[in-house]
A protein has these predicted regions:
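Long amphipathic alpha-helix in the N-terminal Rossmann-like dinucleotide-binding domain
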Residues: 33-38, 123, 146, 211-213
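Acidic, glycine-rich segments within the central catalytic cores of soluble metabolic enzymes
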Residues: 7, 151-273
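Conserved small-residue-rich beta-alpha loop and adjacent elements
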Residues: 7-47
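Structural scaffold positions in well-ordered secondary structure
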Residues: 15, 31, 72, 99, ...
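N-terminal Rossmann-like NAD(P) cofactor-binding subdomain of oxidoreductases
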Residues: 81, 100-156
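A structured beta-alpha segment of the ubiquitous adenosine-cofactor-binding alpha/beta core
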Residues: 2-4, 16, 62-119
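A short, aliphatic-rich alpha-helical micro-motif
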Residues: 10, 89-93, 141
């Protein structure tokens, strides 16, 4: 992919994308934006399930699907047949990255797990996006965005102090996990230049949400209790005041100009313009 007339930063990198919905596709879309050739492998009977999620009109790809799959190529392949599995293994020989976000155990049953594909291409970077990490008591469970946010603690610190836990307006567990996996893949590609070796990368939604919530976990360690919900404010007393305030607009531009060019007001040990 060319960007502004120049080859992308990942020009020459080929990614086999066996992901669906959002957590995986948001990762591979990012790699496509950076110039990688992303080949999306889809079920011949309907393709990625996200193609028809909230479809605005029958017979066309949904807006949801298009938001997470721009810049990709698509290939249909029946993974329930020996021929389909053989095709994927053939494609892996010429790929740099393979990524999947199937339910736990699915790729192994298909014969497309890391150990199987490593035999086809010892240098393959194999990325797995899951809900929960290996060794977790929930490792065999499925996960979608709201589950990932709940398990990672995001919902517990979102909402009003006297209200229920609240889901943020963005799909943080899905796209947030995808972005972290994209960064991890970039690191693996960089290391591969030095070592020539591939590896198996694994990232769980729960772990990603824990990473995004690390200030809340630090609060718990410092105060001996869980960080509270604080609405638009901060749960930390060390943070400056923050909230939504209604203000009247300046009636004349001269008033606004005077404000912008006003004197420095000293506040405690700091200052504000």
């Amino acid at each position: 992919m060319n960007v502004n007339g120049k080859a992308g930063m990942l020009d020459g990198v080929r990614v086999l994308d066996m992901t669906q919905f959002e957590a995986g596709p948001s990762c591979t879309e990012t790699l496509a934006w950076l110039g990688a050739e992303v080949v999306k492998i889809e079920n011949p009977k309907g393709g990625d399930a996200g193609r028809f999620a909230n479809t605005e009109k029958p017979g066309i790809d949904s807006f949801y699907f298009m938001q997470f799959n721009s810049g990709k190529k698509s290939l249909t392949c029946n993974l329930k047949t020996d021929e389909g599995v053989a095709l994927v293994k053939k494609l892996v020989k010429e790929a740099n990255v393979f990524i999947e976000n199937f339910a736990p155990g699915v790729v192994k049953r298909m014969g497309l797990d890391y150990e199987a594909l490593k035999k086809e291409n010892p240098n393959i970077i194999y990325a797995s996006v899951k809900g929960f990490a290996e060794g977790s008591p929930y490792e065999d469970f499925l996960s979608f965005d709201m589950i990932g946010q709940s398990a990672g603690g995001v919902l517990s610190i979102t909402g009003e102090p006297d209200g229920k836990p609240c889901k943020p307006g963005v799909t943080l567990a899905d796209t947030g996990t995808g972005m972290l996996m994209a960064i991890t893949i970039l690191g693996a590609l960089y290391r591969q230049q030095a070592t020539g070796e591939g590896e198996h990368l694994q990232l769980a939604m729960q772990d990603a949400m824990t990473q995004y919530s690390r200030l809340a976990y630090a609060y718990r360690d410092l105060n001996g209790k869980a960080a509270p919900r604080a609405g638009p404010r901060s749960f930390s007393p060390a943070m400056p005041p923050m909230e939504f305030f209604y203000v009247n607009r300046a009636e004349k531009m001269t008033m606004y100009s005077s404000l912008l060019h006003g004197q420095v007001i000293v506040i405690g040990n700091g200052f504000a313009i």
